[in-house]
Amino acid sequence: MIVKICGLKKAVDVAAAVDNGADMIGFVFAKSKRQVTVEKAHELAKNIPANVKKVGVFVNPTEEELMAAIKGVPLDIVQLHGQEPAKQANRTDAEVIKAFPVKDGKIPTNINDYPNAYILLDAPAEEYEGGSGKTFDWDKINRDMLTKNKLIIAGGLNAQNVQEAIKRFEPYAVDISSGVETNGEKDPEKIKCFIKTAKGVE
């Protein structure tokens, strides 16, 4: 199972994720309590080996902002968490994850407008997009609409429920942020526990 640890701001947290087998490291450039600058992400990225993909999280960015981060960090993947047009997701300079909020079990109808992107399903936003710590209603999802080899599950995951999520959705990857935090800060022990638990289900 591919595991993405998102919202990292400190070298110690990046090390905990990398050392325990994370496959993707997420840096949040959108307005958030987990926001980092391109310069900070560049410094943190120096400690990430080439086989671990660096992901930048954005909400309705300009093309200039995307390109600056892709080159400046550098990023392997951009994660679009807003209402970005399909043409912005159709790019060659980075892979793309397109996030969709799932409300009342309904998958947005425009999910098929992004055929080349990984599709990330998340809980509905609160103050900021993503990182709410809440799950969406797993029971109501029509899984026939989903392409498993492009599917990423996020929203309220933790070491206690990730195995259930993997069994239900058989996704390409799982994505976590607040579920590996204690008092709003990343917790290296929770990072380790989550990765080990997620990768125990194949």
Curated annotation (Swiss-Prot):
One GO molecular function term? phosphoribosylanthranilate isomerase activity
Write down the Gene3D superfamilies for this protein, in alphabetical order: Aldolase class I (3.20.20.70)
Q: Keyword Isomerase on this protein?
A: yes
Which Pfam family would be a valid example here?
Answer: PRAI
What class does this enzyme belong to in the EC scheme?
isomerase
Alphabetical list of InterPro entries matching this protein: Aldolase_TIM (IPR013785), PRAI_dom (IPR001240), RibuloseP-bd_barrel (IPR011060), TrpF_fam (IPR044643)
What reaction does this catalyse? N-(5-phospho-beta-D-ribosyl)anthranilate = 1-(2-carboxyphenylamino)-1-deoxy-D-ribulose 5-phosphate
GO BP term, example: L-tryptophan biosynthetic process
**Swiss-Prot/TrEMBL keywords:** Amino-acid biosynthesis, Aromatic amino acid biosynthesis, Isomerase, Tryptophan biosynthesis
Report the pathway entry: Amino-acid biosynthesis; L-tryptophan biosynthesis; L-tryptophan from chorismate: step 3/5
Record EC number: 5.3.1.24
At the top level, the lineage of the source is: Bacteria
Record family assignment: Belongs to the TrpF family.
Known NCBIfam families for this protein?
PRK01222.1-7
**Official protein name in the record:** N-(5'-phosphoribosyl)anthranilate isomerase
Organism source for this protein? Listeria monocytogenes serotype 4a (strain HCC23)
